[in-house]
A protein has these predicted regions:
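Alpha-helical oligomerization segments with coiled-coil/rod-like character
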Residues: 1-43
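Catalytic cores of peptidoglycan-degrading enzymes
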Residues: 45-169
Length: 169
């Protein structure tokens, strides 16, 4: 029946998301070994991180449950092909393409337990192991994966857990 197919699809999507989250946490944990850790927030709008796009407009805030699931970042609506910038200096620890979830995404480790994720890119300009500088172009925006239109989905993680990006911008 249609309802059993729908239930199966939901279960498959949930399993895929759990696998993605597990891989992300493992990459962050591996990169963070020996670099110390931080706890808590740096304060509202600390400026510790730069904006990942030229746009300051936010189309989906943190957290957002309106789509029926958890949205653990903020979305910057931009045209496909717009520059996506490293929010701070660091090392690229994960570059991946999925036809679901984040689509083409990047994770940068900034040390001391702080990392950033940039998703739904049309192209990626860096590789795992690359050192990047704050403001460096790391990707071009798109609408890959589960996306409602071109934007940059941006997450900040502390010790692997998502936190409110607005506290760091």
């Amino acid at each position: 029946s249609q309802s059993s197919e729908y239930k199966e699809l939901i279960e498959t999507n949930q399993a895929q998301l759990e696998q993605v989250e597990s891989e992300i946490r493992a990459a962050i944990a591996s990169a963070s070994r020996g670099s110390g850790s931080i706890s808590g927030s740096t304060g509202n709008g600390s400026g510790e991180l730069g904006y990942p796009t030229d746009s300051r407009s936010i189309s989906a805030g943190y957290p957002n449950y309106s789509s029926g699931g958890y949205h653990g970042g903020i979305d910057f609506p931009v045209r496909t092909g717009s520059n996506v910038y490293a929010a701070a200096s660091g090392k690229v620890i994960l570059v991946k393409y999925l036809n679901y979830s984040y689509g083409r995404y990047i994770i940068i480790d900034h040390g001391n337990g702080l990392s950033t994720l940039y998703a739904h890119n049309s192209s990626i300009e860096v590789s795992v192991g690359d050192k990047v500088s704050r403001g460096q172009v790391i990707a071009h925006s798109g609408s890959t994966g589960n996306s409602t239109g071109p934007h940059c989905h941006f997450e900040v993680r502390v010790n692997g857990s998502r936190v409110n990006p607005n506290n760091y911008l």
